[in-house]
């Protein structure tokens, strides 16, 4: 479990939420959960979050709804997590997994045994009962015995029970080459990525252009809500969603927002 933050940040600070996330990221680095490159990735994401106004755009909400419908329709959905995801949204990952089939797979670009075990500990310390009762399964550490075709890096190592046989994979904060490789395997890929121009965003089936800790609670909300819908309704939500159009609309949204910013707001 992540320990108490080293820096006391007053809740009145205008950057409170952002600073708290930075503290979590730094702590995850100290605990061996995060690779140093994860700090850079987080900073890059913050930049794009500023551009969208640090709130969930209506365009992103449409992607979240489509993602929720696709996850419910899936026969074997898997949530893929890396160090950044565990640092920022471990609670939400587990909550969503429990609404689905419980499968969470650890998949690291900078894969070391030490990082794998650190992430495994983070789940075991906080969700021991859920693991022991089978409500969630943490895959990809001791059972990463399959390889994604045409992906030579260690990132291609996956669990047969998890990503290798999944039909839908939720990949928060994913790399473009891996997202593309998963799509080429015939899988539906749901990405959470603040950069609408990234390869991940462009290659995925559904891209949620939003900050992880805002998007995940909304995704959980709509998964719970959409379970009451029939299959035909869910299929229509997915079929009506156009990822390329959604990304274009998001880029237009950012451009329009920047154009309309007043000097006072700047």
Swiss-Prot record:
Reaction(s) this enzyme catalyzes, per UniProt: (R)-4-phosphopantoate + beta-alanine + ATP = (R)-4'-phosphopantothenate + AMP + diphosphate + H(+)
Function: Catalyzes the condensation of (R)-4-phosphopantoate and beta-alanine to 4'-phosphopantothenate in the CoA biosynthesis pathway.
Pathway participation: Cofactor biosynthesis; coenzyme A biosynthesis
Source species of the chain: Methanocaldococcus jannaschii (strain ATCC 43067 / DSM 2661 / JAL-1 / JCM 10045 / NBRC 100440) (Methanococcus jannaschii)
Keyword match Ligase: yes
Domain of life from the UniProt record: Archaea
Coiled coil feature spans: none
Name of the molecule in the record: 4-phosphopantoate--beta-alanine ligase
């Amino acid at each position: 479990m992540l320990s108490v933050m080293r820096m006391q940040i007053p809740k009145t600070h205008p950057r409170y939420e952002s600073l708290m996330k930075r503290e979590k990221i730094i702590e995850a680095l100290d605990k061996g959960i995060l690779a140093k490159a994860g700090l850079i990735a987080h900073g890059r994401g913050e930049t794009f979050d500023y551009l969208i106004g640090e709130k969930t755009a209506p365009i992103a909400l449409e992607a979240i709804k489509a993602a929720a419908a696709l996850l419910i329709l899936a026969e074997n959905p898997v949530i893929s997590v890396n160090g950044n995801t565990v640092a920022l949204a471990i609670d939400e990952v587990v909550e969503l997994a429990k609404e689905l089939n419980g499968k969470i797979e650890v998949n690291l670009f900078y894969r070391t045994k030490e990082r794998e075990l650190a992430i495994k500990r983070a789940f075991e310390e906080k969700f021991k009962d859920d693991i022991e009762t089978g409500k969630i399964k943490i895959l990809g550490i001791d059972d990463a015995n399959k390889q994604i075709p045409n992906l030579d890096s260690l990132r291609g190592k996956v669990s047969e029970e998890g990503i290798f046989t999944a039909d839908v994979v939720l990949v928060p904060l994913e790399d473009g080459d891996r997202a593309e490789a998963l799509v080429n395997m015939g899988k539906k890929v749901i990405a959470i990525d603040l950069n609408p121009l990234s390869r991940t965003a462009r290659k995925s089936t559904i891209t949620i252009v939003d900050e992880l800790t805002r998007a995940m609670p909304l995704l959980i909300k709509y998964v719970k809500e959409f379970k009451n819908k029939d299959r035909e309704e869910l299929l229509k939500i997915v079929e009506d969603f156009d990822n390329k159009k959604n990304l274009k609309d998001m880029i237009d949204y950012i451009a329009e927002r920047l154009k309309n910013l007043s000097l006072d707001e700047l």
